């Protein structure tokens, strides 16, 4: 059936900000879908609140609304645009839940708007735990014994009858939010209470635990004619009980017999047909390792994280196909864009193994609970392709960028056997390293399989890796052993460690023996049909399938896995850089390892190498492609860290030179630059040992800001207020610095702002100055930013522009740079300069309408700003006010303190734009799900130095009609100023204490700042964690409180007696 002609305008709902469980994969799927619909001549209206996405670029849809994805705003857009239909299946859980809300509100019926792809009944049947169970029973598909609970008591009653352990799964949530495995009634009470609070329909499923079964996933597609097919099947290395987003995953399945595959395949196809889904769907199944018994775990009636992985693993663009099916096309009518000859109904075949490993944020959150379970904790993931399991696994491990290049963590050698066993039984993010350590110690793999429930087949592959390690130790400089190691994914660096040589010596030895990788094509059909895809992976075999063209090429290094401090913003810049390279007439080559992103969509660049971003892997690609140069500015710290090693190998780095990057990042070098320009910066010095650091701090006076050099996202950065704290910090932070010293600066309290600038070597373009709402001391990535600045004087702005221009020229900057300033006593100080694209590039590109990464790339390719048609200096801002707000994922991470400071903690961002600051702020808060009700109780518990400021804020809350509650010290300060306050008891003081009131829903807003006293700190942590668990808006910076008050005041009217 050809495409539908009765609909013309389609709304696509995006997935909003990046949070744990909902990351960049939806930017990739949403972008694909919008472009597919435009290709079919539909008018596309997009709604998304996340500015850091390619999806929200003007050319992706006909109308792009960067607005909050809430009933209020989406309804307003529907009334304005009157689309014929909505496609909600590409915006993750956010898109689905929004579709449900719109439907229940009645607006879809009122405006005669239909839902495409997945009918509401199917969303309900898949997401509502009760309906899902009923449907499976009707189909005769087995589900674990379970009960639905709407209260904690109902949950406890089921578990008492069924026996522990049980799994808790909240309805209509994503990434396992609010779920968990309970082994005791107390655990069940806590998990269920949290799960009910986080489920939009206050419903959880309590099911008998089948932890230990094999977890298998099928990505399936179906069209309106009931044609259904499997795109990809995948097997989790970790058994059921660990969320699939936190599991190592292999595609295709590795340990199933053909009969088992067919059994599960039939079940998956039967389910998509029963749900009548038109598009893509993900089915998760549990298979008993010792029989043919299986259970259906869950069904996602939409494009998911696994769909992005399946798309990249097979080369089959699921989201693009799903969008076309949603508008009526059938699988046998859609061409497969990879082969160009076959149709979409052909099931992809793989002649390689794909391995996905999650990337967790525990390097940032050292106190977090690292145990893995049914609630997802990873922020991102990497994927690697190899000809065998060993190769794919080792390539994935070195793609993670966690400071290791092999499945070996030297620190584990000293762990005793009891601890080792415990870490094997209770899985953490680093279980793979504990497994290999156990195998090195001679633990039999059968025993390990029994302990971990990981299939012995996978453990045998790890054993094989360890046997190769032993061969390398005993056969140094042996080409045969090296060949075996390389074919199984070993890095040159690993071989160098076993041979006690340098990485360059191993590389030279390898190349002298003509041992180099070839590149194979990902073609969806295992070589059965001719294919044109420019999508490759490296392996040590014989035939090279990547043909080098005569055209001059430029290699762009991507940013690797998404983690805190390095998010999708850098992928955004990478994709724009590629567009500019292509427009300039070069062949654009991307190298990246992240399956979730737009940059690893093979249709974006002229060639895509899906490889780890290490010096060895990058040099191998350069050796083959011989590009005119490499661009490292857009790949975050990942790419910047490769600049010097590449330059040392004689590779041309395009844009700002490595020496100039070093002048900006090395403290002593930068001091020389800034002194020569007479630009003020906070007093400070560098220390490479503890004694020096303490001496510097004594000289400067406390508080001081301490940080290692060369980091991104403020890793290990802290404001230290006294000598004992600095002593403690130096023992913990110096480890981070790898031959780089620690910087100790005087900490200036003041307003912070930042600038992104583009320089062509001669002239400087400054698209905008962003003012931070939170004062200095809160990491720029966690601050709300406003453009254009609302409270900076013209003189201060002129000074910022002057310093930016001088620094860009002095540092010979070519391309992007980002500078952070603090304004202290009306004087502008430079805090830091980063000679690369920063995380604010997408936001500033959107609000100024300047495609900054493209302009910078053209400058890097020798086109001056004047030739590009840009005036220099500060660009005049438009009429609107734009606010960028951070979004956090604290509800997914136990034991992570939500207190904001110089170390970055947010996972994503949203944006609000309007004619006034108050309106823009309101939209940003709504988009970030920080909804402050218009009345209720505000709890204030603040440190002594914040009390004067808190009194002023409390007066404003009181004037708006809020009731004030405060802990003893804060209450005294407020009553002294004549404010009516209810004093609440601190924690552990019985029924009416603070936490009980929060749990009972008596508190609507929590304002908490922290003193240095440890006990207060512990109380504060409990208060903050409880407010996150119960979804109470929490503010730990008074500037944010002032911003929210500005919003509330703008929406209220004065009521006064005569």
Curated annotation (Swiss-Prot):
Boundaries of every MGS-like domain copy: 930-1058
Residues that, per the record, bind Mn(2+) 4: 832, 834
Required co-factors: Mg(2+); Mn(2+)
InterPro entries on file: ATP-grasp, ATP_grasp_subdomain_1, CarbamoylP_synth_lsu, CarbamoylP_synth_lsu_oligo, CarbamoylP_synth_lsu_oligo_sf, CbamoylP_synth_lsu-like_ATP-bd, CbamoylP_synth_lsu_CPSase_dom, MGS-like_dom
Annotated Mg(2+) 1 binding sites: 284, 298
GO molecular function: ATP binding; carbamoyl-phosphate synthase (ammonia) activity; carbamoyl-phosphate synthase (glutamine-hydrolyzing) activity; metal ion binding
An example Gene Ontology biological process: L-arginine biosynthetic process
Pathway: Amino-acid biosynthesis; L-arginine biosynthesis; carbamoyl phosphate from bicarbonate: step 1/1; Pyrimidine metabolism; UMP biosynthesis via de novo pathway; (S)-dihydroorotate from bicarbonate: step 1/3
Binding site for Mg(2+) 2: 298, 300
Binding site for Mg(2+) 3: 820, 832
Region (Oligomerization domain): 402-546
Residues that hold Mn(2+) 1 according to the record: 284, 298
Binding-site residues for Mn(2+) 2, renumbered to this chain: 298, 300
Region spans: Carbamoyl phosphate synthetic domain: 547-929
Cofactor comment text: Binds 4 Mg(2+) or Mn(2+) ions per subunit.
Annotated residues for binding of ATP 1: 129, 169, 175-176, 208, 210, 215, 241-243, 284, 298
GO CC field: cytoplasm
Positions with a binding annotation for Mn(2+) 3: 820, 832
Region ranges (Allosteric domain): 930-1058
Pfam family, one: CPSase_L_D3
Free-text function comment from the UniProt entry: Small subunit of the glutamine-dependent carbamoyl phosphate synthetase (CPSase). CPSase catalyzes the formation of carbamoyl phosphate from the ammonia moiety of glutamine, carbonate, and phosphate donated by ATP, constituting the first step of the biosynthetic pathway leading to pyrimidine nucleotides.
The protein's assembly and partners: Composed of two chains; the small (or glutamine) chain promotes the hydrolysis of glutamine to ammonia, which is used by the large (or ammonia) chain to synthesize carbamoyl phosphate. Tetramer of heterodimers (alpha,beta)4.
Name of the protein in its database record: Carbamoyl phosphate synthase pyrimidine-specific large chain
Species name: Lactiplantibacillus plantarum (strain ATCC BAA-793 / NCIMB 8826 / WCFS1) (Lactobacillus plantarum)
């Amino acid at each position: 059936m050809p495409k539908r002609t009765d609909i013309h305008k389609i709304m696509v709902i995006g997935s909003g900000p990046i949070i744990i469980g909902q990351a960049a994969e939806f930017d990739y799927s949403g972008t694909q879908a919008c472009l597919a619909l435009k290709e079919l001549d539909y008018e596309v209206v997009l709604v998304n609140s996340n500015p850091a996405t390619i999806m929200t670029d003007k050319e992706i849809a006909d109308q792009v609304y960067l607005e909050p994805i809430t009933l209020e705003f989406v309804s307003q857009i529907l009334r304005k645009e009157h689309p014929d239909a909505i496609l909600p299946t590409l915006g993750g859980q956010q898109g689905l839940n929004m579709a449900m809300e719109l439907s229940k509100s009645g607006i879809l019926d009122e405006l005669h708007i239909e839902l495409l792809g997945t009918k509401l009944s199917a969303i309900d049947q898949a997401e509502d735990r009760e309906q899902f169970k009923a449907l499976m029973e009707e189909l005769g598909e087995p589900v674990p014994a379970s009960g639905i609970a709407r209260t904690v008591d109902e949950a406890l009653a089921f578990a008492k009858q069924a026996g522990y352990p049980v799994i808790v799964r909240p309805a209509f949530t994503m990434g396992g939010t609010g779920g968990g495995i309970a082994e005791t009634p107390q655990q069940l009470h806590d998990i269920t209470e949290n799960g009910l609070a986080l489920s939009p329909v206050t419903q959880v499923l309590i099911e008998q635990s089948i932890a230990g079964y094999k977890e298998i996933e099928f990505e399936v597609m179906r069209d309106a004619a009931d044609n259904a097919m499997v795109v990809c099947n995948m097997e989790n290395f970790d058994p059921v009980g660990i969320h699939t987003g936190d599991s190592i995953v292999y595609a295709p399945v590795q340990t199933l017999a053909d009969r088992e595959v067919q059994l599960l395949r039939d079940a998956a196809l039967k389910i998509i047909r029963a749900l009548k889904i038109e598009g893509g769907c993900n089915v998760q199944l549990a298979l008993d390792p010792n029989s043919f018994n299986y259970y259906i775990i869950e069904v996602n009636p939409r494009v998911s994280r696994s769909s992005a992985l399946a798309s990249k693993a097979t080369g089959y663009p699921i989201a693009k196909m799903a969008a076309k099916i949603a508008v009526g096309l059938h699988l046998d009518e859609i061409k497969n864009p990879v082969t160009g000859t076959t149709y979409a109904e052909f099931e992809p075949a793989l002649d390689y193994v794909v391995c996905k490993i999650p990337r967790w944020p525990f390097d940032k959150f050292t106190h977090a609970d690292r145990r893995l379970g049914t609630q997802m904790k990873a922020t991102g993931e990497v994927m690697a392709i190899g000809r065998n399991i060993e190769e794919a696994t080792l390539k994935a491990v070195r793609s993670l960028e966690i400071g290791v290049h092999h499945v070996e963590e030297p620190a584990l050698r000293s762990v005793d056997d009891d601890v080792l066993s415990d870490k094997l039984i209770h899985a953490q993010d680093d279980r793979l390293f504990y497994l290999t350590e156990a195998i090195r110690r001679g633990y039999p793999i059968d025993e390990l399989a029994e302990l971990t429930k990981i299939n012995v087949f996978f453990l045998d592959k790890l054993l094989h890796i360890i046997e190769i390690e032993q061969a390398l130790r005993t056969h140094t400089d042996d080409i045969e052993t090296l060949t075996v190691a390389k074919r199984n994914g070993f890095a040159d660096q690993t071989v160098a460690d076993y041979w006690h040589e340098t990485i360059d010596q191993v590389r030279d030895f390898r190349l002298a023996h003509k041992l180099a990788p070839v590149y194979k094509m990902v073609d969806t059909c295992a070589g059965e049909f001719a294919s044109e895809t420019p999508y490759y992976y490296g392996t040590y075999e014989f035939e090279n399938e990547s043909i080098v063209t005569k055209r001059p090429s430029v290699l762009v290094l991507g940013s690797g896995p998404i983690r805190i401090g390095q998010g999708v913003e850098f992928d955004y810049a990478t994709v724009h850089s590629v567009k500019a390279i292509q427009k300039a007439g070069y062949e654009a080559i991307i190298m990246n390892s992240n399956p979730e992103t737009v940059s690893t969509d093979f249709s974006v660049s002229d060639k895509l190498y899906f490889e780890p971003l290490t010096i060895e892997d990058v040099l191998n690609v350069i050796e083959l492609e011989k590009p005119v140069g490499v661009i490292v500015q857009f790949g975050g710290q990942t790419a910047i860290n490769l600049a010097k090693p590449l330059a040392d190998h004689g590779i041309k780095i395009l844009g700002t030179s490595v020496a100039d990057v070093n002048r900006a990042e090395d403290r002593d070098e930068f001091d020389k630059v800034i002194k020569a320009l007479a630009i003020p910066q906070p007093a400070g010095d560098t220390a490479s040992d503890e004694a020096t650091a303490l001496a510097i701090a004594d000289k400067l006076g406390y508080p001081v800001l301490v940080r290692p050099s060369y980091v991104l996202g403020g890793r290990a950065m802290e404001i230290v207020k006294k000598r004992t704290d600095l002593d403690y910090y130096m023992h913990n932070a110096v480890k981070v610095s790898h031959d780089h010293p620690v910087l100790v600066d005087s900490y200036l309290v003041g307003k912070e702002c930042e600038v992104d600038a583009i320089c062509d070597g001669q002239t400087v373009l400054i698209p905008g100055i962003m003012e931070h709402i939170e004062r200095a001391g809160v990491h720029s990535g966690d601050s709300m930013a406003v453009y254009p600045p609302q409270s900076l004087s013209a003189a201060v702005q002129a000074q910022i522009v002057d310093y930016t221009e001088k620094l860009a020229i002095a540092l010979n900057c070519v391309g992007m740079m980002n500078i952070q300033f603090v304004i202290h006593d009306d004087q502008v100080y430079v805090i830091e300069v980063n000679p690369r694209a920063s995380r604010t590039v997408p936001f500033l590109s959107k609000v100024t309408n300047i495609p900054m990464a493209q302009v910078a790339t053209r400058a890097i390719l020798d086109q001056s700003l004047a030739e590009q048609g840009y005036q220099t200096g500060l660009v005049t801002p438009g009429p609107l006010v734009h606010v960028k707000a951070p979004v956090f994922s604290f509800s997914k991470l136990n034991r992570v303190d939500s207190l904001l400071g110089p170390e970055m903690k947010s996972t994503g961002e949203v944006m609000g734009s309007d004619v006034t600051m108050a309106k823009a702020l309101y939209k940003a808060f709504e988009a970030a799900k920080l909804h402050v009700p218009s009345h209720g109780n505000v709890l204030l518990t603040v440190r002594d130095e914040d009390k004067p400021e808190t009194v002023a804020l409390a007066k404003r809350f009181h004037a708006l009609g809020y009731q004030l509650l405060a802990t003893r010290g804060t209450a005294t300060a407020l009553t002294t100023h004549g404010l009516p306050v209810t004093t609440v008891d601190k924690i552990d003081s019985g029924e009416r204490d603070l936490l009980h009131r929060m749990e009972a829903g008596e508190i609507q807003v929590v304002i908490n700042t922290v003193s240095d006293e440890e006990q207060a700190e512990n109380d504060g942590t409990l208060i903050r964690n409880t407010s996150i668990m119960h979804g109470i808006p929490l503010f730990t910076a008074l500037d944010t409180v002032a911003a929210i008050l500005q919003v509330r005041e703008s929406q209220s009217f004065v009521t006064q007696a005569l």
